[in-house]
């Protein structure tokens, strides 16, 4: 199991960082952020969007600042906000252009810089090797270029975010540390050292990735490193380029929710493709669902768990329900079996009643009461899916701890464990870490939750355990079987455990976006969603972060200039300046050339 961060007490202790008229840090509420999607030079449009964000609960808002035109626009935006009594702090997002950062600090409350491209050039996979002398010189250059911004922010009382993106580490960092968590951490620490040496402490850190597993590991590692140095700076949490809709919400919740549940995080942003106002309800639900962990009287410190024998990567024993993959089961109640017509029930389980073919998101099996084993409908289900009887394995939970390690329990092929909270489940696995008996994690929907709130709750409870390698199988006990399949497989995929559908990496859009990102993303999704699981397709609005943040993708569609698209295979641009009206067909052609395309059935 990966090391978790949680220490005694709940929130990681931090300094208070002043951002405009509010504070970020452990002594204050966790702040919700978003970013405008309008062109920053569209002053009126940007002000309207900022006002709309504030109205729905956003507490800090960021705008993109590509150059000096946007710097001038920020002055006007801030003036308009003051005139309209809109007090939300304004943040400038900077990439590649240090001078813009220095100038815009006059007009905004906070500046975000990316260590991967503020001074050094982004890694272009050139294979360049830095000698120790060259590396030292590059650090001196970093100080020369970065220290003026630090000095100005200190003088004006501005805040700063040192925001590392996994996909845009600098060439120098990549050469020394590789594409690693360590590289992400030291990319941030190099800039932090300049701030500390200049006695400037109004800083916040982020360690974003489109992969929740990478993101969680990076934040945990950074928090430990900062605390060892007694640099108690706040953390801004986010899964970058999470995508859209339910899948994007789940991916964000797996990453952000895991960290919030262990006391990490002082401000959050859910990067969802579409209108930024859609991000705020997700953030509010995340904070609501993770707040219960701070109130728990049974906190468990997962720092004590360094390894679990229930690793998701191991091959499961032959007698376990599902071999060689992390299994997904659904529970069928008597009500399901007695009131739903057999063909309808099979369709709800993803079985084509005409061909008998199972959908990629059909469960690996169903769990039913033993009293129903002789019914005709069970015989019909058994033709298509494996059946397990609820009473054949112990059902463990917080209320029967005396059974967890009993001889009778340990003699069974596997056990179910009902997960009510992350703490309780981690404690269960810690006590059993010397036993190889497989565990099926069992989940039920909590009462009175909306569909979105239920998805967020399950993403946190299951996602945190998946990221730490716990369990061998999951069982969802829902009345809505289609919802169980949708949520179950999406969470497994978001945690990089099991891929069943195409994964889409798409940015939320910002003032740099060169096309209608939600519309194009949806069109590409509709044309490719039938392709096999495991494939990753990125749709990115511009070339500033696009090529880096889609480094995990197999294929990429990236805005290069107005009306033009660059197409990527892995991190290599293979077609440049493709007219937008042809770009989707060209993407399909690339998929065909690389042998991953198939015609829809």
Curated annotation (Swiss-Prot):
This is 4-hydroxy-3-methylbut-2-en-1-yl diphosphate synthase (flavodoxin). [4Fe-4S] cluster binds at residues 507, 510, 542, 549. It comes from Chlamydia muridarum (strain MoPn / Nigg). Pathway: Isoprenoid biosynthesis; isopentenyl diphosphate biosynthesis via DXP pathway; isopentenyl diphosphate from 1-deoxy-D-xylulose 5-phosphate: step 5/6. The keyword Oxidoreductase applies. Belongs to the IspG family. Converts 2C-methyl-D-erythritol 2,4-cyclodiphosphate (ME-2,4cPP) into 1-hydroxy-2-methyl-2-(E)-butenyl 4-diphosphate. It comes from the Bacteria. Keywords: 4Fe-4S, Iron, Iron-sulfur, Isoprene biosynthesis, Metal-binding, Oxidoreductase. The keyword tRNA processing does not apply.
